[in-house]
Amino acid sequence: MSTKPEKPIWMSQEDYDRQYGSITGDESSTVSKKDSKVTANAPGDGNGSLPVLQSSSILTSKVSDLPIEAESGFKIQKRRHERYDQEERLRKQRAQKLREEQLKRHEIEMTANRSINVDQIVREHYNERTIIANRAKRNLSPIIKLRNFNNAIKYMLIDKYTKPGDVVLELGCGKGGDLRKYGAAGISQFIGIDISNASIQEAHKRYRSMRNLDYQVVLITGDCFGESLGVAVEPFPDCRFPCDIVSTQFCLHYAFETEEKARRALLNVAKSLKIGGHFFGTIPDSEFIRYKLNKFPKEVEKPSWGNSIYKVTFENNSYQKNDYEFTSPYGQMYTYWLEDAIDNVPEYVVPFETLRSLADEYGLELVSQMPFNKFFVQEIPKWIERFSPKMREGLQRSDGRYGVEGDEKEAASYFYTMFAFRKVKQYIEPESVKPN
């Protein structure tokens, strides 16, 4: 039996053969997408999508083939997109100028041997994003399909590990975008903590506007990774600790600025969870990042890649110079840009084996870890009928399958991975190393 790992969908066959040796026999057989036919009974294409019945004919119709009324609708929609694009260009120009000024200041600070205050950058960024967000224009966003895909992933994660009556702690809860998802799971209490006060205020507004949420919600402004959670939650006696669930969605990478912060994050998780409780979340896939970095020669000073949707830029080539290995599992900073969402914010690589090792120290056992595309293909058959018609429409690609396509595929399906741990033992904090 072959001991080779499964080839990630984002890795070319040539690169896989180079790294693990060539394959022969049945392992080497492939099917050309051009020649293969999709049937309604096929389980999926392995690309983070699921085939469906022939329902894409309407989606692929040309404007010229449609009735006059429909053609007029397309023109109106096009004008709305043009107005939105113009407003977005102006907004992004202002935001980019501000971000460049901030990064320039931080570069000067680094030159003076002072550390970057990434927490402040992140706080300012998400405060700004909250202020400029206009939910009425959400459906016109150029990354609406990516947002739908990420929401589907979170629905699946929450449903897989959350039980009715659970108490949930979400670290980095943002504007409360998952409140309705947890309502569907039937939880009894939601505790959300975020470093951005503007995001917490927006989460309060969102919660007050929602109906039929029959669970208690506690929303708190606080630093989830830089200090003990006790500092943030002490003024809120209604919080019911320990929790059944701790969740971190698209934010744990900020904790990997230093080993101290990463350990504080895992300690906060471990101290907040019951034995048997689950810690799950979503993070950038360190193996995909390595794969991309490995393609750059040592002479390239600032490795960078991306497309029209996202861009990743490392500030130096220390990875390449260190024989294509990170010099440390912590502090491996890059800036991340995502169209209509994130404006060149500093983030940190989360080497998954480091996360797994830390989690083990704090009594957390790995249950599952999968790239988004693989997790989506595994879970979507259970969700096709559960999702609302609007959600299904939002997930449908131009070929009739479900998932993401084009540039959005790499930005979501390939760049991110899910994980889940279970607390199996109580962590005893040594007296001599207890943080203040």
From Swiss-Prot:
GO cellular component: cytosol; nucleus
Keywords: Methyltransferase, mRNA capping, mRNA processing, Nucleus, RNA-binding, S-adenosyl-L-methionine, Transferase
Resulting phenotype, V168A: Still viable; normal growth
Documented EC number(s): 2.1.1.56
Effect on the protein of changing Y362A: Still viable; normal growth
Location in or out of the cell: Nucleus
Residue span of region Disordered: 1-50
Annotated TM spans: none
Superkingdom of the source species: Eukaryota
UniProt effect for mutating Y254A: Non viable; no growth
Effect of D194N: Lethal; no enzyme activity
Stated role: Responsible for methylating the 5'-cap structure of mRNAs.
Family: Belongs to the class I-like SAM-binding methyltransferase superfamily. mRNA cap 0 methyltransferase family.
Stated name of the protein: mRNA cap guanine-N(7) methyltransferase
Organism whose genome encodes this protein: Saccharomyces cerevisiae (strain ATCC 204508 / S288c)
